């Protein structure tokens, strides 16, 4: 048992020493290499999307149906093209759930017997009673308010067979040893990209938007890794 505990502690210490925060002591958080965010981490199920119908030959025409705009600038439709994602999130939600359950149960059983013989008299009686009372009360309330306004450039990383685009983009800003990271990925239709080559976040299917940070402030807000391990394995 002692050896197992020692092994667990050693593994925890090793994991803690490998933390990136240890390598950044005394210096600002390092930024990711350019191009590291151009990956759609969750591959879509291509079989769920219909294939692009066969198009008629355009002959010698310069018109491109995918652009669908004669007097507007070209929009992103090919792998490597860049478009802008407009993120405007202003959500508020409030949930209030209340549960009250009560049950009472009572059972009784009586038994009696008496008799007489030439040698002795006997009398016997019994009484059994059982009762239970169960009551459960629960009250839960959740309030959430989010407001986010950002613009981020994304790159077309793939084109599905039906013409929809896979996009992925990231943005990192480092201020006073604090690194703010914005990631966005999803599937868009070329027709939803406006004339300014901008698409709203609510028109992105399978959208994956994350906004967070890494640095000294985040380390203070998070509990120590040792406490997280104890909270994970503690049965109480």
From Swiss-Prot:
Q: What does this protein do?
A: Assembles around the rod to form the L-ring and probably protects the motor/basal body from shearing forces during rotation.
GO MF, one term, reads: cytoskeletal motor activity
Report membrane topology: Lipid-anchor
Q: Where is it mainly found?
A: membrane
Q: Where in the cell is it found?
A: Cell outer membrane; Bacterial flagellum basal body
Record carries keyword Lipoprotein: yes
Pfam families reported for this sequence: FlgH
Q: How does it assemble?
A: The basal body constitutes a major portion of the flagellar organelle and consists of four rings (L,P,S, and M) mounted on a central rod.
Q: Which family does it belong to?
A: Belongs to the FlgH family.
Say where the lipid (S-diacylglycerol cysteine) is covalently attached: 17
Gene Ontology cellular component terms for the protein in this record: bacterial-type flagellum basal body, distal rod, L ring; cell outer membrane
- Superkingdom: Bacteria
Q: What PROSITE patterns does the entry give?
A: PROKAR_LIPOPROTEIN
Disulfide bridge map? none
An example GO BP is:
bacterial-type flagellum-dependent cell motility
Task: Point out the gene that encodes the protein.
Answer: flgH
**Name of the featured protein:** Flagellar L-ring protein
Keywords noted in UniProt? Bacterial flagellum, Cell outer membrane, Lipoprotein, Membrane, Palmitate, Signal
Its signal peptide is 1-16
């Amino acid at each position: 048992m002692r050896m197992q505990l020692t092994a667990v502690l050693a593994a925890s210490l090793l994991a803690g020493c490998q933390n990136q925060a240890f390598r950044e002591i005394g210096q600002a958080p390092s930024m990711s290499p350019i191009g590291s965010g151009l990956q759609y981490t969750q591959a879509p199920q291509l079989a769920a999307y219909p294939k692009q119908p066969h198009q008629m030959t355009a002959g010698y025409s310069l018109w491109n149906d995918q652009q669908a705009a004669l007097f507007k600038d070209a929009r992103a439709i090919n792998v490597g093209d860049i478009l802008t994602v407009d993120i405007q999130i202003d959500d508020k939600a409030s949930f209030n759930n209340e549960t009250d359950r009560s049950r009472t149960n009572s059972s009784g059983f009586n038994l009696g017997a008496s008799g007489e013989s030439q040698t002795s008299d006997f009398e016997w009686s019994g009484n059994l009673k059982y009762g239970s009372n169960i009551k459960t009360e629960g009250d839960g309330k959740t309030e959430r308010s989010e407001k986010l306004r950002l613009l981020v450039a994304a790159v077309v990383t793939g084109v599905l067979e039906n013409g929809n685009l896979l996009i992925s983009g990231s943005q990192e800003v480092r201020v006073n040893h604090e690194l703010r990271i914005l990631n966005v990925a999803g599937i868009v239709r070329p027709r939803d990209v406006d004339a300014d080559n901008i698409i709203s976040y609510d028109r992105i299917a399978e959208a994956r938007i994350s906004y967070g940070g890494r640095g000294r402030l985040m380390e203070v807000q998070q509990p120590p890794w040792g406490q997280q391990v104890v909270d994970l394995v503690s049965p109480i």
